Amino acid sequence: MVDSNTQYPETGALAPAPADSLLISNVLVYGEGEPTNVFVKDGVIAAIGGTHEADRTIDGNGGVLLPGFVDMHVHLREPGREDTETIATGSAAAAKGGFTAVFTMANTTPVMDQPVIAESVWFKGQNIGLCDVHPVGSITKGLEGKELTEFGMMARSEAKVRMFSDDGKCVDDPQVMRRALEYAKGMDVLIAQHAEDHRLTEGASAHEGENAARLGLRGWPRVAEESIVVRDAIMARDYGNRVHICHASTEGTVELLRWAKSQGIPITAEVTPHHLTLTDERLETYDAVNKVNPPLRESRDAEALKKALLDGTIDVVATDHAPHGSEDKCCEFENAKPGMLGLETSLSIIVDTFVATGLADWRFVARVMSERPAEITRLPGQGRPIAEGEPANLAIVDPGKTWTASGADFASKAENTPFEGQEFSAKVTHTVLRGKVTCADGVAQNA
């Protein structure tokens, strides 16, 4: 449960909540107890239970009410690649997926290494109003791995940047990474590392294993990730600042994270739905929709990641939502760009993998998709308990809604989902952002 007394740095200026009331009826809070009503007034939960008159009403139809989800890792491609995604289409995809806040990575064109770029993204997200879009600043200027971005200016900007990452590239120079951790410590911002020693992955396009060897694909070894994870864990230990590992993908990374946490090192990690559920067996078709960075690994890696998420060794689920146009995916596997869509399938995958199988309950879903991401990013107002006086950032899930994934039906501009044609047994039906309904009956609402 989130500590109500924790004080986090403020965000950029938020769009005002609706000055009216909303009644969410017939929902199971955290999937527990009997169906109840939740009354929202001026963007805040005013009452749980009872009968209330309201300006607007949502019939939850016995669905599960959870805190709105927070995604620490998305690529909304704006500015620079609006042909594949925009803040508007990405926000709509987020709303459909139950997300009330996302963190969009810095590998844009131009790179998100200046306050004016971050502020533009923040303000545009607030004007669209479907999801809080938090810009992630780059660790180094131009993602070149040499000179640090001005963390202080970014953190003090109107976007209030609180996370920095060169995601897509690794900060592989240890001196640069050391300076980044030391600089970040003074202003309590988070450093998120894309763990990849590029000297070990040059020219690689698939997990280094039997399948890649048989198919003639250059292999991407586990050690390329694990060597950076252990280095950065030791740096976090010695220099005392938090470090977050993006998209953990190997069994060895899990072991290293477990060791680091046992030593009290301030390290956190995320895992994607695709690394939890897909393996390199999908390489057989040479379909580039399965190309991703880091690559899909083996079944033993996926199993280790599941166990690590269950026991808290891995803290959160993050989608690494990465839209690409068909020209970047419908080509030779080696030449295709890595990345997969994730915002509109994440909840369904986590429910089918953990809740439907009896491995976890709905509180677990709230923890890994809402509470912990908000805690790690020091994000006020998100990941909060469903309780009176808390912001009404909420998602309703129909746990019995069977649906089939189709990229053509997604709100995202792109269609590169590896789950095309897969049937799921749960779906987000409604999303509420500070009392504003951003998704209704599975449809993103116009701003």
UniProtKB/Swiss-Prot annotation:
Record flagged with keyword Metal-binding: yes
Pathway per the UniProt entry: Pyrimidine metabolism; UMP biosynthesis via de novo pathway; (S)-dihydroorotate from bicarbonate: step 3/3
Enzyme class: hydrolase
Residues that hold Zn(2+) 1 according to the record: H73, H75, D167, D320
One annotated GO molecular function: allantoinase activity
Superkingdom of the source species: Bacteria
Keyword Methyltransferase attached: no
Essential cofactor(s): Zn(2+)
Documented EC number(s): 3.5.2.3
List of residues binding substrate: H75, L76, R77, N107, N293, H324, P338, G339
Gene Ontology CC: one annotated term: cytoplasm
PROSITE patterns given in the database record: DIHYDROOROTASE_1, DIHYDROOROTASE_2
Family named by the database record: Belongs to the metallo-dependent hydrolases superfamily. DHOase family. Class I DHOase subfamily.
Function: Catalyzes the reversible cyclization of carbamoyl aspartate to dihydroorotate.
Record-linked HAMAP family: PyrC_classI_B
Protein name: Dihydroorotase
Originating species: Corynebacterium glutamicum (strain ATCC 13032 / DSM 20300 / JCM 1318 / BCRC 11384 / CCUG 27702 / LMG 3730 / NBRC 12168 / NCIMB 10025 / NRRL B-2784 / 534)
